[in-house]
Each structure stands twice: as C-alpha cells, then as structure tokens.
From Swiss-Prot:
Belongs to the NmrA-type oxidoreductase family. Homodimer. Interacts with ASS1. Interaction is enhanced by low NADPH/NADP(+) ratios, which results in inhibition of ASS1 activity. Keywords: Cytoplasm, NADP, Nucleus. This is NmrA-like family domain-containing protein 1.
Amino acid sequence: KLVVVFGATGAQGGSVARTLLEDGTFRVRVVTRNPEQKLLADLAKRLGLHYVVYSGLENIKKLAAGHFDGKGEVEEYFRKPEEYIGQNVGLSTCRTTPEEYEKLGFQGAQDLANMFRFYALKPDRNIDLTLRAQTLDQWLEQHKGDFAHL
C-alpha cells in the first residue's frame, strides 16, 4: 500500500512516516512545506530519497507582504457596498519602515519607499483638492478630443 504523509517534517507527521516505514509493509511518500529544513535533508539521505518534486511558484504572500490587502478590501467595499453594510470588515497592516520596504527588491519598491518618506514629512493633505480629483473615466471623457488624432 502507498501512503502519503503530509507535514512530514513536523513532530506528528514525522512520527507517522517513521512508524509506517519501520512496519515494512507500506510504501511511504512525504510532503512538506519547508524542503530546506536540515531534518528533511538528513532523513532523505538516511532513507535513500529517490525523487524531489519542487514547486517553482513564488510565495506571493511573502512577496507582497500584505501591503496591498487593505486596498483590495476597500476597493471591494466601494464596488459592492450593499454586501458590506452592517458587516464587520477586518483590515490590518504591518508597520514597515521605508528602509525595510525598499529592500523588498521588487520593481518600484524604491519609489514606493520614497513616497512613504514624503507622506511622513508632509502629513497634512489638501482635502478640497482631493474632493475635486477625477476618475480616469471622467478625465478621458473630458479629454477625448485630445486623442482624436491618434
């Protein structure tokens, strides 16, 4: 019988995998979220690991670090407010400094870090100007004649 053990580098999963292997009547496959653990490497060497399947997908939660999740929640609210009226909506963020942010290494991280520095220096906002801001659709409608020759 073939048995797949998930969480094999944890205490419970590791124990299950070892017990099944020691029994000798089972073929065992193990799955782990962290293939870089020393315990896994030692176990693989000891047992004569035959295959490693590695997923090359990036960990999007690590890359984005949750910085834009709140923006997405707010956007959803504005698109479908009737679904959120009277509901509790949880928004959270971390306290990342501009220096930490620019080290994230994605394209535009330095620009965003500089924007955060600017906002920290000038916390006052011109609310009247903000209220006059247009959506892209409004601006395009107002300026569509400017694009007629293109």
